[in-house]
Swiss-Prot record:
The record marks 168 as: Important for catalysis. GO terms for molecular function: glutamate dehydrogenase (NADP+) activity. Catalyzes the reversible oxidative deamination of glutamate to alpha-ketoglutarate and ammonia. Belongs to the Glu/Leu/Phe/Val dehydrogenases family. Substrate binds at residues 92, 113, 116, 167, 380. It comes from Salmonella typhi. SUPFAM superfamilies: Aminoacid dehydrogenase-like, N-terminal domain (SSF53223), NAD(P)-binding Rossmann-fold domains (SSF51735). Homohexamer. GO terms for cellular component: cytoplasm; cytosol. Keywords: NADP, Oxidoreductase. It is an enzyme of class 1 (oxidoreductase). NADP(+) binds at residues 211, 242. This is NADP-specific glutamate dehydrogenase.
């Protein structure tokens, strides 16, 4: 494309190439809208079709996964691995198992992952993968057979210096273990090709907690910079999975009163706030095969908002930790009307562009996911470092490194987001991540 083209021309070009990939188009629009003024001031980043290369994955692998269920019936699922950008290191990003998974969602996640990984300062490129397989309601044997069948194709595209996947929605330690085991068998090589592994075979302490902990570390830094803090604040958390659970735990440790958790069926509201004992029970319920927050609400006699999200509950801080586009403009209006002070994304792109704009216009502190939830992939990078050195660090060391990385990410966001009373963290995160990747791409020529 012409280096002098407008923002809308560029976005139309992206939309025209993939007209049905709405999630991916949304992610590109969000990033490029904040980048464009910076690009106009720094035209060297328009050279060598850099932007066109940046929004096109280096490689997309699509394949079928054929497996047998417990009734000995043949099941067929689709799977993908999007190897988006390797300019600063091997592709790095999770595997997602959920019926909603499609190529558009994985491209959006891989695109976001590229900038997120760059923000960590660790040498990791961006990638993402997954399948429309739904692990919910499946037996452990069915999950294992699916994971093993998937790896019979995927293994040939992975390697410690090529592509290192991890977990995501629907993929926890169990699934990572099944996939890593099959990879080892097929490749006859025990090198690190997955992160989020169990401690018994190369996993890192703090990795399960890292995304939730990192979210709170970043949010606390953002609050402190503006004369606030978690102490005494009412917090709404959406979701009740891994990220939400550890975000609740760390927010409580910082003195917050967390009053909500949710799943796809509804929201539990606890005005007295979670306690360590209550959180432990929620984790037990969610770990069961069909556990729901409704079960938790009934057990403790709490308010349950069936079919609703947490955003109608008056809070000071909102931490969306469930899924993309869960917080729309109507929910944003309610949060703002109820006096919300800060919103930080624990999930990937959980806030719509319109809602994000509304928060920024209202002066609400807003932390985008590529910065706020980078703790998970940062600790994955630390797991890779431990594996490469044949070492296992103590939990305190990993947690300290995680905290330091999140503070560095916050500093980078402030540097590029405007060092004033209200930093634009969306702009700061996008520019900081972009500069790291773009400089590497320009230095390596047209490839």
């Amino acid at each position: 494309m012409d280096q002098t083209c407008s923002l809308e021309s560029f976005l139309n070009h992206v939309q025209k190439r993939d007209p049905h990939q709405t999630e991916f188009a949304q992610a590109v629009r969000e990033v490029m809208t904040t980048l464009w003024p910076f690009l106009e001031q720094n035209p060297r980043y328009r050279h060598m079709s850099l932007l066109e290369r940046l929004v096109e994955p280096e490689r997309v692998i699509q394949f079928r996964v054929v497996w047998l269920d417990d009734k000995n019936q043949v099941q067929v699922n689709r799977a993908w691995r999007v190897q988006f950008n390797s300019a600063i290191g091997p592709y790095k990003g999770g595997m997602r198992f959920h019926p909603s998974v499609n190529l558009s969602i994985l491209k959006f996640l891989g695109f976001e992952q590229t900038f997120k990984n760059a923000l960590t300062t660790l040498p990791m490129g961006g990638g993402k993968g997954g399948s429309d397989f739904d692990p919910k309601g499946k037996s452990e044997g069915e999950v294992m057979r699916f994971c093993q069948a998937l790896m019979t194709e995927l293994y040939r595209h992975l390697g410690p210096d090529t592509d290192v996947p991890a977990g995501d929605i629907g993929v926890g330690g169990r699934e990572v273990g099944f996939m890593a085991g099959m990879m080892r068998k097929l490749s006859n090589n025990s090198a690190c090709v997955f992160t989020g592994k169990g401690l018994s075979f190369g996993g890192s302490l703090i990795r399960p907690e890292a995304t939730g902990y990192g979210l709170v570390y970043f949010t606390e830094a953002m609050l402190k910079r503006h004369g606030l803090g978690f102490e005494g604040m009412r917090v709404a958390v959406s979701g009740s999975g891994n990220v939400a659970q550890y975000a609740i735990e760390k927010a409580m440790a910082f003195g917050a009163r967390v009053v909500t958790a949710s799943d796809s069926s509804g929201t539990v509201v606890d005005e007295s706030g979670f306690t360590p004992e209550k959180l432990a029970r929620l984790c037990e319920i969610k770990a069961s095969r069909d556990g729901r927050v409704a079960d938790y609400a009934r057990e403790f006699g709490l308010t349950y908002l069936e079919g609703q999200q947490p955003w109608s509950v008056p809070v000071d801080i909102a931490l969306p930790c469930a899924t993309q586009n869960e917080l729309d403009v109507d929910a944003a209006r309610v949060l703002i009307a109820n006096g919300v002070k800060a919103v930080a994304e624990g999930a990937n792109m959980p806030t719509t562009i319109e809602a994000t704009d509304l928060f920024l216009e209202a002066g609400v502190l807003f932390a985008p996911g590529k910065a706020a939830n980078a703790g998970g992939v940062a600790t994955s990078g630390l797991e890779m470092a431990q594996n490469a050195a044949r070492l296992s660090w103590k939990a305190e060391k990993v947690d300290a490194r995680l905290h330091h990385i999140m503070l560095d990410i916050h500093h980078a966001c402030v540097k590029y987001g405007g060092d004033n009373k209200h930093t634009n963290y969306v702009q700061g995160a996008n520019i900081a991540g972009f500069v790291k990747v773009a400089d590497a791409m320009l230095a390596q020529g047209v490839i």
